[in-house]
Amino acid sequence: MSDEAPNEIELNDEQLEVVEASADTRLLVIAGAGQGKTEVVVSRIGSLVLDEGLTASDEILVLSFSRAAVSAVRTRLDVRDVAAPNVRTFDSFASVLLLGAGIEPEGSFDARIRRATQLLKEAEQSPDEIESLRHVILDEVQDLVGDRADFVLTLLKWLADDAGITALGDPLQGVYHFQLDDSLSKTSAKDVCEALTDSFGCETAGLGKNFRARGKFPKQVVLLGGELRATHDGEAAERLLEDLLLDAPDRGEIADWYDLVTPRKGRKTAVLCTTNADVLRVARYLNDKSVAHAVRRQAQDFGAARWIAGALGPLPGPKERRSDVEAALERLLAENDVDQKWNELKSAEGRTRDFDSLDLHRISRLIKARALPLPLTEPDLSSVIVSTIHRAKGLEFDSVFIVEPTWLPDGEDSWTRVRREYVALSRARDAIFICRLPHFKTKIKADDRLGRFKEEAWSRKTRGATWTKAFEFLYGDVETAYPASSHAVDARHIQETLGSLDRVGVRVYAELDETESTAEAPSYLLVTRDQQPLGRTSAAFGSAFQKTFGWLKNRPTVIDGLSLVSVETVAGDYRESERAGLGISGFWLVPRITGLARPDLNTT
C-alpha cells in the first residue's frame, strides 16, 4: 500500500464489489502491485462503518506487515472523517493478546507469536480482543508463512460465524518463503490461501487495472506482471524478466548516481538492495557523501512516536483525565490533531469503560512490549529510503534505484528471483534505474557471535587472514534504561534537542566518554556534526565493541559511519525520569541510529 494520500480514485466495478460487500462477506482479494489496494481498504472500512454500522475501534481489526499501509489508511480515513479501526502488525497484536491474558510479552517476536498461538489454542472462550470483532482485514497474506501463518489461522477460528474477512494478497509478490527453512512451522502462504477459501469460506475476487504506474518503464512492469501471472514455468518467467531489464535505464556504479537520488520537494526515492550487506554499503556511501537518507527497518523496530513523550512525559499519572491529556497534546500538535491522537491513545489503552481518562501505566506497558498500534509509532520521514527489497514491500516511490546484488546464494530457483525483482520493479510510479556497487576490497558478512553484520578487511601482514574494520550498529545499541546525559550537558537539554530535531538522516558520531567507560566496556556519546549530544551507547554495544576491538591498545575516541533514523519515545522506570528532571511518568526520548560503526583508528 502507498504511504501517501493521493487524490481519491474512482473505483472500478471489481473494486466496488469488494468495497460494498456486506460485513459478513468473506473475500480473498488477489491484489497486484498498484491496483488500488489502499483505496479499496480505505473505502471498505468506510463502508463497514458508515453503511454497515460497525464500530471502527472495537469491531474492525486490520492486520498488516506494513507501516506504509497503516499510514495511508489513517490519512485517507481522516480526510473522509471516518474513525480509524484497530490497525496493528501481526506481531503487535500477538503481544496485545498476551498482555490481555496477563502474560508479559518476552523473548523474540517469533517466540511471542508462538506463545500467542498456544494461548488461542488452549483458550476455553474467545479473548476479549477477538470476541467483539465483526470484520478482519488481512494485508499481504502472501507473506504469511510459518509461525505467523499458524497464528492468523488460529485467530480466525475464534471469529463468530457471521464475522467477515477481507484478505488481500498477490502470490507474485510472495518473497518470504525462505523463512520456512528456519521455522518450526512449515505452513506456507499457499496453505494460508487454501485455508481461507476451503476452511473459512472466502470467495476469490480481483481489483482490475493498475493505478500506480505513470512513467513509461513502470507501465511496462505492469504488462510484465500480467505475463508472469500467466506463466507457470520458472525459467520462462525469468526470461521474461531479463528481456524487460535489457530496456531498463542503467546508471552505472554508485559514484555515478549517488547525487541523483535526492528528489525534489514532495517526492520520494528508494534505493533497493537484495541483501542487508548491500544496504549497509549503500548507506555508508551516502553517509560519507552527506546525502540524507533513512535505512528502512523491520516493522518490529519502529518505536513509539516522539510526541508521546512530549505530551505524556510531564503528566504525573498513573491515570490522567481526558482534559489534561488534551491540554498536553495542544501544546505540541496542531489543534485538528488533538482529537485524533487522543482517540489513538485511548484505542491502544483499551479501557473503553473509562472513556474520560487515560491509563499511563497501560501505555507504558504497551511501549515496553513494543505492542503499540502502528498509528502510534514513529514514521520514516526521509525523502530517500535505502532498503532491502523485502522491507520495501507495501511502499511506493516516485523513483526507484535497483542495486544489482553483489552476492546471491547458490542454487537460487527462478521463481525466487522473479518474485523479488518484480517486487522491486513494481515500487515505482515514474522512473526505474538499474545500478550497481563497485568491487570492494572488504567483505560484509553475518557474525553469529556478535549477532550482527561486520565488515572484514584482508590483512596486509598475513596472507588469507582478515581483521574486522566495522560492525553493524543495531536498534538496541542506544541506551534506553535512563535518559542520556553527560558531564557537560544534562538530560533535559538532550531531551529538548531530540524533541526539536527535524534532520532525520544526518550523520552521527560516537565520541568516547572516559568518565562513563569501564575497563570491561566503553561508553560513547552519540553526537551530531555540530556536537549536539543525542544519546549514549548501550551495554550491548559496549560488549560487541569489546569482543571486536578489545585487542586495541587504546580505545578510539571517535566512531563514524552512523546516521540518525528517527527519534522515538521509550518507557522506563519513573525514578529515572524523575531523577533527570523529566517528571514521574517514565517517558523520554531516544535517538535510533543505523550504519556500520567504524572506529577511527587514528584516534586511538
What residue spans do the PLM features occupy?
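P-loop NTPase Walker
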Residues: 1-104
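Conserved helicase NTPase motor core
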Residues: 9-33, 86, 95, 100-185, ...
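Core RecA-like ATPase module of SF1/SF2 helicases and allied nucleic-acid translocases
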Residues: 35, 67, 92, 96, ...
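A short beta-strand-to-loop transition that corresponds to the Sensor-1 phosphate-sensing loop
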Residues: 45, 64-67, 91, 168-173, ...
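Short glycine-/polar-rich loops that comprise or flank the Walker A/P-loop
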Residues: 56-59, 161-163, 170-171, 199-204, ...
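Conserved interdomain hinge at the start of the Helicase C-terminal
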Residues: 250-267
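Conserved active-site motif detector
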Residues: 447-604
